Amino acid sequence: MSKQENNEDMITLIDENGNEQLFKELFTFDSDDYGKSYIFIYPAEQENDDSVDIQAYIIADNEDNDGQDLVPIEDDKEWDMVEEVLNTFLDNDGNFKA
């Protein structure tokens, strides 16, 4: 997925079919163990919902070095680490605590 624009915590993702979807950034973090940056996002239309579909991606410079791409996390151990980071920011009811 390519990360098109980042405007005040808002990100437009473009899928392989050219469809755009607006997401809100929850937070980003860096991992020294993996040497990568990560981002948690959720669909903007879910902002006021009781629950949201949080997605996590690796932030990587794109091949043209003119922007960034969001890359799926495919390694199970890496995914466990990312999930653990997210869980430190969720309360017992699954609500985000900043």
Curated annotation (Swiss-Prot):
Domain of life (superkingdom): Bacteria
Pfam families, per the entry: DUF1292
Entries under InterPro entries matching the protein: UPF0473
Recorded family membership: Belongs to the UPF0473 family.
Designated name of the protein: UPF0473 protein Lreu_0536
